[in-house]
Amino acid sequence: AMPNMMDRMADALASRGVTSAWVVHGHGGLDELAVSGPNTVFELHDGQVHTFEVNAKDFGIAVSTLDDIRGGEPEDNLAILRDTFAGKPGPVRDIVTFNAGCALYVAGIAGDVSDGIERARASIDSGAAVAVLENVIAITHREATRMETQP
């Protein structure tokens, strides 16, 4: 999120009945948590908003540059994601597990961010993440075909 909009976004979520959320501004201007430096977080929890910074390096994740995670054409990005979900180590896996780990914490599935990161890594290592990815791809293709054939 844009830094000057984060408080309004958190307030809007609270007004809509959301009880747990993070509105983030990633290092380098990302709209997700970055592994390149500190990230600003507005945390909504039970109607209260708290602001803090979270840094991937504090969870043992190597610092990487934005160029290390930059994608390209959709086909290239899918190949990168498939490699990542197949267990390929590196900056893309790091940013995926960091964001997923934080999301698992915010959703109440993980007890803390470290636990969430470990769960995300386990999902990749077990093959569960790639199974979900392939299912999403299949559903997307099926729905696109269905929409193309409708009058």
Q: Can you annotate each of these PLM segments?
A:
Residues 1-151:
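Glycine-rich anion-binding loops and their surrounding alpha/beta cores
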